Amino acid sequence: MDNNPNINECIPYNCLSNPEVEVLGGERIETGYTPIDISLSLTQFLLSEFVPGAGFVLGLVDIIWGIFGPSQWDAFLVQIEQLINQRIEEFARNQAISRLEGLSNLYQIYAESFREWEADPTNPALREEMRIQFNDMNSALTTAIPLFAVQNYQVPLLSVYVQAANLHLSVLRDVSVFGQRWGFDAATINSRYNDLTRLIGNYTDHAVRWYNTGLERVWGPDSRDWIRYNQFRRELTLTVLDIVSLFPNYDSRTYPIRTVSQLTREIYTNPVLENFDGSFRGSAQGIEGSIRSPHLMDILNSITIYTDAHRGEYYWSGHQIMASPVGFSGPEFTFPLYGTMGNAAPQQRIVAQLGQGVYRTLSSTLYRRPFNIGINNQQLSVLDGTEFAYGTSSNLPSAVYRKSGTVDSLDEIPPQNNNVPPRQGFSHRLSHVSMFRSGFSNSSVSIIRAPMFSWIHRSAEFNNIIPSSQITQIPLTKSTNLGSGTSVVKGPGFTGGDILRRTSPGQISTLRVNITAPLSQRYRVRIRYASTTNLQFHTSIDGRPINQGNFSATMSSGSNLQSGSFRTVGFTTPFNFSNGSSVFTLSAHVFNSGNEVYIDRIEFVPAEVTFEAEYDLERAQKAVNELFTSSNQIGLKTDVTDYHIDQVSNLVECLSDEFCLDEKKELSEKVKHAKRLSDERNLLQDPNFRGINRQLDRGWRGSTDITIQGGDDVFKENYVTLLGTFDECYPTYLYQKIDESKLKAYTRYQLRGYIEDSQDLEIYLIRYNAKHETVNVPGTGSLWPLSAPSPIGKCAHHSHHFSLDIDVGCTDLNEDLGVWVIFKIKTQDGHARLGNLEFLEEKPLVGEALARVKRAEKKWRDKREKLEWETNIVYKEAKESVDALFVNSQYDRLQADTNIAMIHAADKRVHSIREAYLPELSVIPGVNAAIFEELEGRIFTAFSLYDARNVIKNGDFNNGLSCWNVKGHVDVEEQNNHRSVLVVPEWEAEVSQEVRVCPGRGYILRVTAYKEGYGEGCVTIHEIENNTDELKFSNCVEEEVYPNNTVTCNDYTATQEEYEGTYTSRNRGYDGAYESNSSVPADYASAYEEKAYTDGRRDNPCESNRGYGDYTPLPAGYVTKELEYFPETDKVWIEIGETEGTFIVDSVELLLMEE
């Protein structure tokens, strides 16, 4: 160890001359109550007042969260800083204190809101306020606690981490108990309860891990090291481990009533000696070895103290302890002699078991420096007197060995209640006294006789008392006897004491219990254990077998004991005691030797207590049984939805493994069977959304902005999210076809599912006609109305469930009409989250329903026949127009005279083919899709061939001035007809482009333009030298006709009318067109849309803005002119300019002539 002269850094603040001032590196830090005082008070509070309600909330405020300021929080940090000699950096320190201050302020608001609500629990405003305050408090703690575990400072921050963790668990318990009365839905409450049980383990494991890390860090070889080691162990047991050991009691479903816990761990005051410093090299291991190894708890009855003398000084040389087992259930036993049996004075017997035991010692120390000659050349460090004070409500006199002293044990282990005298408010009582000694002969350098006082928490009662109105936890270290093969081992740090261990079958232990309730009172037993093997527990009372049950392994062999290694299990069969004083026996059987079984405690629970776990089991059993049509689980009830099965599965998953593991497994298998039956009757492919657009002809198809998300509090499995769209002609969509082969003739089918929230969600079922609903489901925080109880934890209001029926007439596999299932959103504010979709057989059609579907089917067939007749005519005309564009049936070359207007005219005739796509969603092919796509593909080829002949890039200026060289000022403007045109407003401006050509080939330069005002507009083509030609444009009013101008102003308009020319956007196609239906109220009343099949074609309003409708005619006044040009080199230049006024150019084309 480093012998730093600045030794005050290792001195605990509560051992200084002024307990109100702490010293750290020369700083003076003013404090109020010490962290140990506060922690002892908190532990007492948790042991005695662990009942949820305003009393508990306000108690936490009074003890810590309402009285602490920055200096008090800083004291918690200083405490561990001094022990481990590590200073927290200023930033981390200030951040931690600021967070603690914020939590304190927020919790005071929470506590006041809780108090007001408890006084008026039905007040809606106060209920809402509690929901707000809980959410704020939970969010703040969730954010803050990781900051108390910041890297490199986990140990110095450990005590404040535990304080914040304790607060968080208390708040989560509040919502688990009172959340429904505050207005939270069952799903939220269950989720927060799951957080509670998970965080109990997480917070516990963090605290124990870093406690052990800090303890290892302060260990050293010398006595001074041991002093610091023991101080760390003692103080962090009080400020960390004791509090952590009570965390499991926050589980409100396992401990729904008052629960009494006991702390049986022991802590040790430092050896009461002067000059007990680092001069005793190598003595740390010896001092630690003088402490008792793990053992059963016993009751200290008396101490017989022996006295010896040295150089005329009398001192405590040795002693013998007499003790009794817990409950005084056996004969008194005597421990071996500690120290030596001195005879310099008569032995003195201190009776320790008076009142509530010895709570305080006041010791006198004796230190004599060595002389230089003979026997006197020795150092003497001993105890020459001690006063033993009894804890009692009366003035019971103390017992004194020789004399009282000034070394007060309360300086190291303060009372837990400073509002009463220490004899009443003490926190610990003396449990044992051992001795560290050194120097056994006259040749020894020093003589040390150091009594080692062990202390146990006062909650560890002398008897094992079982009342009728509370859950009683009894650590098994309070057993009377251990079974052969059972041992006591050191506890893992979070059990509040040591634990028992067995590695072979047999009796674990027996303990004496005293029943204060009437013997008619019935109880259930629970066991907290950890095991590497499956095993069977047996219990008996006074030799009478009571319970026997099989329980599973909780950990793997060789793993460390952690919070999650332990499980609390119970027997369902209640029992009663026959005698007021009985012997309870616990045994473990049916496992192979060599495995490890650890037992922490047993619990006696009044049988009248209705546990949440029992209620959950009954509710889950009822919910599972109601899924099926009969008790043998052959079939599902028709009205049982897939979503409902998932919620029942959630209910089963939430059952306690500790309380009903076997029943949980059985119910889980039944629910899985129900899920399989649900999947079998569901005609949808991939109902769980494993993917969209994975296969061309199977499963779900959808737009690219749909997302698949995993399960959450609402959905157990995958669900989809549909977002709004900025263009109603490009909706968000999801669809699937039910194959004809899956359908039965004259049967009604139902589409149903669950919507978490939606706006403007349109749902379609399409066969002979379109069934359509628009569904708006508000996404409120509560999915279950407050006025109605939720039958299942995560089930929601029925309005979140939707269903839509469709009737099927006769079926025809060749026709393969099937049923289209479509979900669509076409508004900007629209959205939806939905899942658990089903399409299933509902019932055969009879009576009026049968007649109605036959009538609808006949109308549909009549309409289909008429459509086929019309289609034959339209197809013939369209095909002729398309064929006329090409030179042959291979469709690989255009006719020499084919121009853009002819292609547009043919395209328009192709688009006159009806029912190419469903008007409800134009990405779904209709009955004429094949012939339409055949002709549309040739139109696309025609456009491609035509584009290949035009060697000018961006000749229509749709990409602005890209590819053009510009001099002066020009603009590209979008006209009212949505066409982009080049505007040359000044005579000095010029636009040009260099074009590569094939020398010796012929080209046609074609320009469509309009001239405003006087002057001429010119489009010139030329090479480097000569070979120049141009097209000139003037205002049509002048009626000038130029050479080579083959079309006049009026001619162009006439050409447009002749071909009805419109332009198709080849990039967009028709994959977004659909019917625009007005929204209907979400009353779920289905209606046939028969007139869509009787009144003619279902119009698609987006069609005028899509496909060929994108090409709009030019206004009157535009002129198209062309000339022939034969380049002599491989480059030509196209130049655009004007002499006066404004020149407007729609397009420039340079077309390669056919050979």
Curated annotation (Swiss-Prot):
Role: Promotes colloidosmotic lysis by binding to the midgut epithelial cells of many lepidopteran larvae.
Family designation: Belongs to the delta endotoxin family.
GO BP terms in the entry: sporulation resulting in formation of a cellular spore; symbiont-mediated killing of host cell
Organism ancestry: Bacteria, Bacillati, Bacillota, Bacilli, Bacillales
Additional notes on this entry: Toxic segment of the protein is located in the N-terminus.
Pfam families: Cry1Ac_D5, Cry1Ac_dom-VII, Endotoxin_C, Endotoxin_C2, Endotoxin_M, Endotoxin_N
Gene Ontology molecular function: signaling receptor binding; toxin activity
Name of the protein in its database record: Pesticidal crystal protein Cry1Ab
InterPro entries according to UniProt: Cry1Ac-like_dom-VII, Cry_V, Galactose-bd-like_sf, Pest_crys, Pest_crys_Cry1Aa_dom-IV, Pest_crys_dom-III, Pest_crys_dom_I, Pest_crys_N_sf
Domain of life: Bacteria
Coiled coil: none
SUPFAM superfamilies the UniProt entry points to: delta-Endotoxin (insectocide), middle domain, delta-Endotoxin (insectocide), N-terminal domain, Galactose-binding domain-like
Keywords attached to this entry: Sporulation, Toxin, Virulence
